[in-house]
Amino acid sequence: MSKKRLYEIAKELGKESKEVVARAKELGLDVKSHSSSVEEAVAAKIAASFKPAAAPKVEAKPAAPKVSAEKKAEKSEPAKPAVAKEEAKPAEPVAPKTEKVAAKPQSRNFKAEREARAKEQAERRKQNKGNNRDQQQNGNRQKNDGRNGGKQGQSNRDNRRFNDQAKKQQGQQKRRNERRQQEDKRSNQVAPRIDFKARAAALKAEQNAEYARSSEERFKQYQAAKEALAQANKRKEPEEIFEEAAKLAEQAQQVQAVVEVVPEKKEPAVDTRRKKQARPDKNRDDYDHEEDGPRKQQKNRSSQNQVRNQKNSNWNNNKKNKKGNNKNNRNQTPKPVTERKFHELPTEFEYTDGMTVAEIAKRIKREPAEIVKKLFMMGVMATQNQSLDGETIELLMVDYGIEAKQKVEVDNADIERFFVEDGYLNEDELVERPPVVTIMGHVDHGKTTLLDTLRNSRVATGEAGGITQHIGAYQIVENGKKITFLDTPGHAAFTSMRARGASVTDITILVVAADDGVMPQTIEAINHSKAANVPIIVAINKIDKPGANPERVIGELAEHGVMSTAWGGDSEFVEISAKFNQNIEELLETVLLVAEIQELKADPTVRAIGTVIEARLDKGKGAVATLLVQQGTLNVQDPIVVGNTFGRVRAMTNDLGRRVKVAGPSTPVSITGLNEAPMAGDHFAVYEDEKSARAAGEERAKRALMKQRQATQRVSLENLFDTLKAGELKSVNVIIKADVQGSVEALSASLQKIDVEGVKVTIVHSAVGAINESDVTLAEASNAFIVGFNVRPTPQARQQAEADDVEIRLHSIIYKVIEEMEEAMKGMLDPEFEEKVIGEAVIRETFKVSKVGTIGGFMVINGKVARDSKVRVIRDGVVIYDGELASLKHYKDDVKEVTNGREGGLMIDGYNDIKMDDVIEAYVMEEIKR
């Protein structure tokens, strides 16, 4: 008979599939889902159950349809013995079965059930073993019969074996199906399947109904309270409105509490939650084993159901807790909806380039999405984290009606701004300041002697080699007025120091010896002063010498643009003798006169700014810097930034070595307290606090490092040849240590200017201070030697230098350092050799000796032929071979040389093609001194 699926029956009746499934279960049918199939008679029975007329019949005889349907199903499958056993049992009515589904399951004796199942499995396993043994004996018997039968019965045996295997497989499949049907019936009887979808739908409908009832009650209460509040607040003050609103809210809460205390009576709901059912495990038997090995075991459906039941139970528990929490939340009074505050737009907006949309939105108190939309309408695609340029920000502010102003950001690390800002100085606080005078001129023209005379001390006698090594800053008093003097070196190596002195000075005193006249450094000093736009006072010194000629000096200076006022120029000329203190007062009066004409003024009320004159490292004090205060007043404990360093002024000393606490404009002082020694010529400035000074100093150091890295020379087509050529040069590595920063600069510049073809100077390291162990370690690693200028090595450094074979050269005069370095560079060059011919000889006879070679008998016709000389073989005026002698003999004796007019024999190394009348030219290579 044909079968029908439940969803087909539902489609014919116009019902939903789940209704048909539920009706089939009510009729006692074992169906699982809408895709389950039933016989046509059962389908007709299900269809008839939906008709009103058929309903009484079903109630009168509930068990009759099921019994008939089961009998029909059993007749359709007569081969199943398990079904036949079921026929013998009395038919159970359907109604009691449906009652079991709704009722609570009774307690079971699981221990007794497990023991019974174990006994059944043991008996079945024993029976299967006997069957397998009989089958094995039959198989062995068949094999023996096949072997005895011969070739003729081979096909018959194969057919019988195939039939036996087929029967065996059919029997196993039959027993397997019977067991499965028994297990399914047993599981259905113990725990019938539950329609979880129907139960979940019922539970959800019940919860929705409960929530709708409670929500409707709360909504009505809220509407009533709102209407009452609106009527009462028509003509009341805001304070009264808020008080009454609070009272009404309390009343609403009380009403809600009463509603919760006295809930309405409802019929108890049927517990539709899924119960955890204990299903028996599947019987494991030996039917899944065959001769070729065990088969893959079937999945344990019971254990899967247990896991699924446990998950659903946990989900229900969590859902229950969540529903309870929501119920508590529903009982609370709803929070009033707060209206969004309206912020007025500012009238002005100060912006900087690179502001993001989010920053602008925060400043004008608008949402970023609103600004993004406006920008989109303006044709600008942007996100809230995107930076905008100044023009876009201005257009955006115009759209909002806000006046946009660009914020001028001040670079806190820029010291130079203090020197150029117009508003830094107070015009009302300006006072007259002392002039800063720089004494410049050629070496040994008497600059330091003049300054010594001015200070009434003997500083000049202490200068090594008669030249000043670094700038000296001093202050004297003349006619109650202070004058600050700077003494600059006159040697050619100190060009940078003279330029630095001219840049901070107000007046330049150009010292020219009356007997020497204008010299190279004199011209250089003139150029520095003109570049700095500084007036020049010419002091013609050494007029006491017999060969003095001041007129010649005036004429030579006029050729270089320094004209005397007597000749219509603007430079004052004073003839002096610094050694004998002649006309010194007149020179000082001239200085004060020129300073008065310049009207030099400063503001002592502002924070101090100025220039570094000199810097050095002291063993006990650390970094020591000589500063010239140009504006403001410098105090002890001031936070200060000097060049790329920073610190706090711990101590100040004047030019006399006395400690001072205050330094006004045009005052030279030495300070301590910096973290590093600055560079001479750097500017300094005092900051408000140490935090800002530290930030500015660190930022300046970072910028200097980045600038140094970016200054690395890159190879291009223009400098490719120079780069390749520099790679072929030899290098002299030098480490320079000096007493002051100015000497380090001068020495480094002078050494790098030394021009020796093929050799260059590489300054590995240069610093201020004594030679220490780290300098020796660096020299050893870089294969360099150390030059100490006015410094000495520490005892530990000296011992380490001797152990590591590092050369240390100490000097106090700069031109001696330059001469010594030039000699060292020339010694680095490869020696040059010149060829010198020492003699000639003619081959008179040749002798060929086996295993030796060709011997040439010769006579010296000019000079001599030496054993260690090189020879050329010349034939018909052409050089045939150039090489060395293998042996030289006079008759049978080995000799070192054969002189003119004598005969001998020779062999040439690597050459045997000597012929008669060949000319042998002997020569040597001599080294040429550079």
Swiss-Prot record:
Organism: Streptococcus pneumoniae (strain CGSP14)
PROSITE patterns (UniProt xref): G_TR_2, IF2
Renumbered residue ranges of the record's region G1: 441-448
Main location: cytoplasm
Protein name listed in UniProt: Translation initiation factor IF-2
This protein's encoding gene: infB
Residue span of region G3: 487-490
UniProt-annotated stretches for the region G4: 541-544
Molecular function GO terms recorded: GTP binding; GTPase activity; translation initiation factor activity
All residue ranges annotated as the tr-type G domain in the record: 432-599
